[in-house]
């Protein structure tokens, strides 16, 4: 699959939507701490997107999903559903995934958080995962194939982790 190139105008609209999504993660960072529910974080993100950014939380309504963010804790790899029952604890690893829709364009991003004091192996996991992300991003360029991104990530992850997670083709 070849990556489709966008016009300069399309890139600017896309970039703006992505900036809004990144801004949500910046805003929520100070609230991500032990004792907080993922539902509380979801509510804060909803309020910020709709009231401050005058945008739409793109996840809401997608295939019946009713939340603003995905909040994945520890062994939940992705798309965890925020809940009043999911309370962050010291030592947790959490990923928040947010998608903002503005003027028809989607900005989608996520951020990994270490809650409180984390074990060294958790810190290493987050560090290696981020390195893999940047290596994959480096593969994105005109004419590149999407498989190149996965191959780059896999090559680095195999150095650090004995069995990387693989998605079914």
Regions found by a protein language model. Name each.
Residues 22, 125-133:
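Residues forming anionic-ligand binding surfaces in small-molecule and nucleic-acid pockets
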């Amino acid at each position: 699959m070849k990556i489709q190139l966008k016009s300069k105008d399309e890139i600017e609209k896309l970039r703006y939507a992505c900036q809004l999504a990144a801004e949500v993660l910046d805003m929520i960072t100070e609230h991500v701490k032990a004792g907080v529910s993922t539902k509380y974080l979801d509510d804060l993100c909803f309020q910020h997107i709709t009231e401050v950014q005058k945008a739409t939380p793109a996840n809401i309504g997608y295939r019946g999903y009713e939340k603003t963010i995905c909040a994945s804790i520890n062994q939940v790899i992705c798309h965890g559903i925020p809940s009043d029952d999911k309370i962050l604890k010291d030592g947790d690893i959490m990923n928040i995934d947010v998608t903002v829709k503005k003027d028809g364009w989607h900005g989608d991003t996520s951020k990994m958080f270490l809650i409180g004091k984390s074990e060294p192996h958790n810190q290493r996991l987050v560090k290696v995962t981020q390195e893999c992300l940047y290596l994959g991003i480096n593969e994105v360029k005109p004419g590149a194939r999407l498989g190149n991104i996965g191959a780059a990530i896999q090559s680095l992850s195999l150095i650090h982790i004995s069995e990387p997670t693989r998605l079914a083709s």
